[in-house]
Amino acid sequence: MSSSTDSTPIEDEIFSESRSLTFQMLLGSTADSLQLSRFELRVVRFFNDVCVPFMTYNVNKRHVYVWEKVIPRYFTSSSAIRSAVLAMGCLTIMPLCGLGSVLNDKLNADELTRELEAASETWKVQRVFADDHLFEGAKMDINLFTRASEYFGGALNGSNEALMKYQSPDRTKQEKVNYLNEASISNYLIYSFLALQPWKLIPLVSFAEDGYEPKNDLLNVAMGLKTIVFSDYDLLITSDIGDLFHADELHYVPPRKVKFVEDLKNQFNDYLGGISFFDISSEKSAFINDIRHCLLFLEKAFILSVKFNYPVNLYKWLVMISPQLVPYVREKNFFALRLLYAYACICIHVRLWSFEHSVWRDYIVWFRNKFWPLYEFDERLFHYVITKKRYVNDENFQTLKNFDVWSQEFDY
């Protein structure tokens, strides 16, 4: 059986450019007919030209078809998806405007917000939208950061509303499909936005301080996305967006060892070395099985990334294994924190960020400061991705098969 990442000549025809209500067609419409400003129409173009290729890599034709041909239909009818698309489009534009130059590790969330808002007022950013044909009437100032924040807030509100409508007991099956799809796509984009944004909107992990409730974090968002997707998985995967959430390729991964994951497996065995067989309680047994499940899925994600030069399963890993990993991170289990650290380093290496400053980098720096001195494996990872800034180049993810932390290129 072929995986959903493969395509056949028949699929090449089915998913060809000849079929379509696409973002390209939307972009050929007038702004007024879509009830968009001309600024928003340009943002949609950035989403189509940059975000969609980033999410599909033009490898999985089923995914390409959904993003290019199906999502535009929801864009015109769903305020949640429209806001999420516009938020992602704005975020995509920001690095192209040089906004990364104001980011600094020493700035907190409020300071970053002020810096990005002020930088977005400069002509260097404004000129991107200053074409004569772009604005009608009086001059309009576009603050890219403010717009991104507003659209993101709209996406959050819209996705919550769609989820409540889906959960209402008096909905028809078709209404439930529509609202489930709306909630799934908008939350998929919300998770992506939060993973990519650089201004500390939420951290990767937030631990409760004494006397305070824990703040929201990316782990919660990952678990929430998986909960939505699996609330009625059979209904979702048979819908017109179902191909985005099929995981059939994970069930047909060829057996192959991955050096990076083998190292983590060996370190987990070392971690368990001090536990006697007779001391293994049901809780410890569940922990061992859960971590091994996480490592197995990480191994599969690596193999598929190399085989298809397609890293999307690496991006999805945290969502997919969140029920198994997150509870132990919340308990501050050291190996769970280390595994998340290793994954964050991989996210940096494969460029799961819009700016070098990201939730992944923040967690890596926090972990290193918290548990200094690190194990040599962890320290070598830190210098490779943070100090040396060694990233995947030219979208050549097949280099992951040679990702060996003990090799000379990781020396520091």
Please provide the spans of the model-predicted regions.
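Amphipathic alpha-helical dimerization/protein-protein interaction segment
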Residues: 1-167, 408-412
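Extended, leucine-rich alpha-helical cores of fungal transcription factors
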Residues: 63-84, 110, 138-146, 173-182, ...
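Short sequence/structural elements of tandem HEAT/ARM alpha-solenoid repeats
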Residues: 102-106, 203, 358
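Internal, conserved structured core segments that host functional sites
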Residues: 98, 134, 140, 144-228
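C-terminal effector modules of eukaryotic transcription factors
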Residues: 34, 38, 42, 73, ...
